Amino acid sequence: MALTADVKDELTKVEVSKTTVRAAELATILRFSGGLHLIGGRIAVESELDTPELARRVRKDLAELYGVRGVVSVISTSGVRRASQYLVRVLDGGETLARQTGLLDAHRRPIRGLPNRLTTGSREELAAVWRGAFLASGSLTDPGRSAALEVTCPGNEAAMALVGAAGRIGVAAKAREVRGVHRVVIRDGEAISAMLVQMGAAQTVSNWEELRQRREVRATANRLVNFDDANLRRSAQAAVAACARVERALEILGDDIPEHLQYAGRLRLAHRDASLDELGHYADPPMTKDAVAGRIRRLLAMADKRASDLGVPSTEASLPADFDEV
């Protein structure tokens, strides 16, 4: 997940001056990375994050935007966790914070999706929503067939809200559920680049695009190699078949063969691996590949007719048993 770490590292360093944009990012991080909990009868806001840098960013925004103190603690690795997590918790003033960020509605009920003011905000605020969601629970895979920018969501409503936010900034995203886990996915390469730019990961976009182009060049080269290999196999198989049929034709006709047809047949047998174009160059005087093909075709037709008259096997009877018609 090196790319994911690169994106998150870059996004953590994005500097935002507008209060509404900072608030949109923070509210989304809180929604996608934790939630509301009752501790001693009081509502606490918790956020479980990947890096100490992001934990510091969240703590700073909590203090500067809402005047509350976030307590940071480290959740050590375990059998399930492969890396330490950083828990930011606000207990004193937690309910007020939950209301101010939109995590609680007017009736003290936890919201199911995202606060309406976030999903209907400005383009900059919508980009901040996506930045917050990615910082909280996003991932970016290497470019290729399975390339994807993906965000794990706390529920279907949150996933649909994120899809809507992407659409409003011109990026197509899809929500999907796998074994009860809701995700929003962007798969198109251009769309992934566009979203990374919107979120503020310009350097990662450059690296990702370079990697994507290298993969595309390699894939194209592989397709061409496979195409060439297939063509070479077909050409080789056709040459083997032609030589086998020509040998049988000369055997059937004996000396009763027009000289120009016999010459074409002998030419084919003398240069078994050559293409029709190359056979034409070997001829004396030179011939076009169509002329060579035409003479060989007439030679085989004459031999097959003679074989039919005599009641003996035709030229096709000489084809190898494992010959594949192409």
From Swiss-Prot:
Involved in cell division and chromosome segregation. One of its GO terms (molecular function) is DNA binding. Belongs to the WhiA family. The keyword Cell division applies. Transmembrane segments: none annotated. Residues 275-308 bind DNA. It holds the Pfam family WhiA_N. InterPro entries: Homing_endonucl, Sporu_reg_WhiA_N_dom, Sporulation_regulator_WhiA, Sporulation_regulator_WhiA_C, WhiA_LAGLIDADG_dom. This is Probable cell division protein WhiA. GO terms for biological process: cell division; regulation of sporulation. Keywords: Cell cycle, Cell division, DNA-binding. HAMAP family: HTH_type_WhiA (MF_01420). Signal peptide: none annotated. The keyword Cell division applies.
